[in-house]
Amino acid sequence: MRLSRFFLPILKENPKEAEIVSHRLMLRAGMLRQEAAGIYAWLPLGHRVLKKIEQIVREEQNRAGAIELLMPTLQLADLWRESGRYDAYGPEMLRISDRHKRELLYGPTNEEMITEIFRAYVKSYKSLPLNLYHIQWKFRDEQRPRFGVMRGREFLMKDAYSFDVDEAAARKSYNRMFVAYLRTFARMGLKAIPMRAETGPIGGDLSHEFIVLAETGESGVYCDRDVLSLPVPDETVDYDGDLTPIIKQWTSVYAATEDVHDAVRYESEVPEANRLHTRGIEVGQIFYFGTKYSDSMKANVAGPDGTDAPIHGGSYGVGVSRLVGAIIEACHDDNGIIWPEEVAPFRVAILNLKQGDAATDAACEQLYKELAAKGVDVLYDDTDQRAGAKFATADLIGIPWQVLVGPKGLADGKIELKRRSDGSRENIALAETVARLAP
């Protein structure tokens, strides 16, 4: 993509309405625009990051055996009355009526709808286990939306729903999602810690929140520092095998949100030097809720003996749009965003330091075409801005690799390669650049 043809409305000043780093940098970098309180338009740069995150989530869900579908944003109120949650959910749920006076709601979550789909088609235990997921926009009418995408009213979320014949099988499904989440967040360059948490309006008696430690987080957390060094399973993990050792390794080290924090256990189990009390950002949460929805909505299957019994369920959410903000909170410096490579909107930025110079223009064009041909996401700054402004833009939007091309270096057949994560620079041969940066 040529920057001269890209829509990148960068702001020079810090927006006054932005209270935290991620909100400020997303607005300054031209990633989004607020259209109403807690509702944003995703501009091209932000949209590219959103799609990268969404794809990682999708790949790890598929790897764990979940199957993608897509449910609508609007749901029938009668489904929620059937589960008993319509009146219990509260003012965060946006309730509307169509022209025929049918009561609808803009879905804040999808347990009822997926249970209705399941019960319409699945009648036997032989069709289990089953895990269905979708990635869809949701709406919760927060009383005080703030912090940009961290606490917006409209947000993109992945939610998966597992169906199993009994509790033992359901806990295996829960464990698969637990491990899938560890891998998902690690691929994004995040250290997300699973912590015991309240189940809230979803229900059930088992839940873990996945928390990224950050002082700007809304959740108070307590944990043993040892959890920060636990290994994340690699891509060879066998989701059909026994995942219990992995789960035990991660859950045997104390980590809890303040809602379920056990001070006595914390002080008895965690050495004082290892105690960490801080704040964090919730980027995902998983639940096992047993027969909560299958009982009320009569989602039964015939067991091996032919007797109908309610299925055991779980739900598993990832805040896809919230992750954009969480990554920025964890990965930034005074100059701007520092994107991990897997979620960066572009992997490489080519900076033409003397636009109009024939040799520099030709070298940049050649690099741009060769990198693009290799499948590299590349942004070529071919504008007539001065070099300092180009450096500032590249740092602000956080492109992992910057290729600095100017007449002085080209005279020796070299370009300067800058790594955004640590600011390191090196001179390399122009002829070696593509091989160095192509995956």
Curated annotation (Swiss-Prot):
GO terms for cellular component: cytosol. Gene3D superfamilies: Anticodon-binding domain, Bira Bifunctional Protein, Domain 2. Its main location: cytoplasm. Its EC number is 6.1.1.15. It is found in: Cytoplasm. Keywords: Aminoacyl-tRNA synthetase, ATP-binding, Cytoplasm, Ligase, Nucleotide-binding, Protein biosynthesis. The keyword Ribonucleoprotein does not apply. The keyword DNA-binding does not apply. SUPFAM superfamilies: Class II aaRS ABD-related, Class II aaRS and biotin synthetases. GO terms for biological process: prolyl-tRNA aminoacylation. It catalyses: tRNA(Pro) + L-proline + ATP = L-prolyl-tRNA(Pro) + AMP + diphosphate. One of its GO terms (molecular function) is proline-tRNA ligase activity. Homodimer. Catalyzes the attachment of proline to tRNA(Pro) in a two-step reaction: proline is first activated by ATP to form Pro-AMP and then transferred to the acceptor end of tRNA(Pro). Belongs to the class-II aminoacyl-tRNA synthetase family. ProS type 2 subfamily. This is Proline--tRNA ligase. The lineage of its organism: Bacteria, Pseudomonadati, Pseudomonadota, Alphaproteobacteria, Hyphomicrobiales.
